[in-house]
Design a protein with these regions (language model features):
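Active-site region of glycoside hydrolase catalytic domains
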Residues: 2-44, 87-89, 97-335
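Active-site-adjacent substrate/metal-binding segments within catalytic domains
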Residues: 24-100
Length: 336
């Protein structure tokens, strides 16, 4: 091995990630409606929707076979809450739950580690109509959903992610209006929603630890624009690190991991922070782009179809900065 080579350990997890509304389809089969099902029409640029998608609900065995074929040893998927509780009685929908049992069994049978995301943007309409994140009931409703899933699947699943990209579904869905349910609200409403999501995260962590059959590994999966250093001088690294966590990364991560309200999260009380900050086993990070105030850095960078600069080394700095701040094992749970 050359000195500049890094050898990944044998138990390193190489995987892929999806979300229920992105791939499952079967939107009205063994499932209640979600906010994406009822608000996407007229709000998505090219008219895409979640009705059929990849038809993963009916073709999951083929999909798992493809995962095995390309050599994945882990797979992150999300549970559709509306598939577990699909009517107003709050009775468990066994057909929906059995889908996830069967999927998990198929993954394990093929030597693929299942990693479960409990919320990936798709609030059930039944919960939304109760007030959603603005309802005092949300935390207990989410806790009951988590308990149901954990009791059913934790004999096979070790890795749990409470929320995927709260920065996106809160600020994109309720402030900027570019994600479901496509609302534009003021600061007070957005802060109230942030508080609810963070409290629900804490409740989910406690619930997983209480009911899990296998010893659980728990985290959450934020995303944020990483500020790239222009060079590796100590001063520049510190500037980039500080700037990264002045935004959404610190606003969400500090309360949930450190129990500290910083960078625009000062609306949280000490009691809130106590309930939000439960010990985590890893810090997940979805890394899609870098950011830098210096346009000089961006000149000549290749760009994605979304216009985002492609900087492979951003994954290195994301992991480096996240570990420096939170001291937890790092999962890169999405990248692109």
């Amino acid at each position: 091995m050359r000195n500049n080579e890094f050898v990944f350990p044998k138990d390193f997890l190489w995987g892929a990630a999806t979300a229920a509304p992105q791939i499952e389809g079967a939107y009205n089969e063994d499932k209640g409606l979600t906010v994406w099902d009822v608000t996407a029409d007229g709000n998505v640029r090219y008219g895409e929707n979640c009705k059929v998608a990849c038809d993963h609900y009916h073709r999951y065995k083929e999909d798992v076979a493809l995962m095995k074929k390309i050599g994945l040893n882990s797979y992150r998927f999300s549970i559709s809450w509306a598939r577990i509780f699909n009517d107003k009685t709050q009775t468990v929908n066994e057909n929906g739950l059995n889908f996830y049992k069967n999927l998990t069994d198929e993954l394990v049978k093929n030597g693929i580690e299942p990693i479960c995301t409990l919320y990936h943007w798709d609030m059930p309409v039944l919960v939304y109509e109760k007030g959603g994140f603005l309802s005092d009931e949300f935390v207990s409703l989410f806790g009951n959903f988590v308990k149901t899933v954990v009791c059913a699947l934790s004999d096979k699943i070790r890795f749990w992610i409470t929320f995927n990209e709260p920065q996106c579904f809160v600020h994109g869905g309720y402030e900027g209006g570019w994600l479901a349910p496509f609302q534009k609200n003021g600061k007070f409403i957005v802060q109230k929603i942030m508080r609810t999501v963070m409290l629900a995260h804490g409740e989910a962590v406690r619930t997983i630890r209480k009911y899990s059959v296998l010893p659980p590994k728990i985290g959450f999966a934020p995303t944020a624009s990483l500020t790239m250093p222009v060079n590796d001088s100590a001063e520049e690294l510190e500037r980039a690190y500080t700037q990264t966590f002045k935004g959404y990364a610190g606003q969400w991560g500090d309360p949930m991991v450190k129990g500290v309200a910083a960078y625009g999260a000062d609306f949280l009380s000490k009691e809130d922070l106590k309930n939000i900050c439960e010990p985590l086993d890893f810090y997940a990070f979805n890394v899609y782009r870098s950011d830098n105030s210096s346009e000089v850095y961006k000149q000549g960078m290749p760009r994605s179809a979304l216009g985002w600069e492609i900087v492979p080394k951003s994954i290195y700095y994301a992991a480096k900065f996240a570990y420096k701040r939170y001291g937890l094992p790092i999962f890169i749970t999405e990248n692109g």
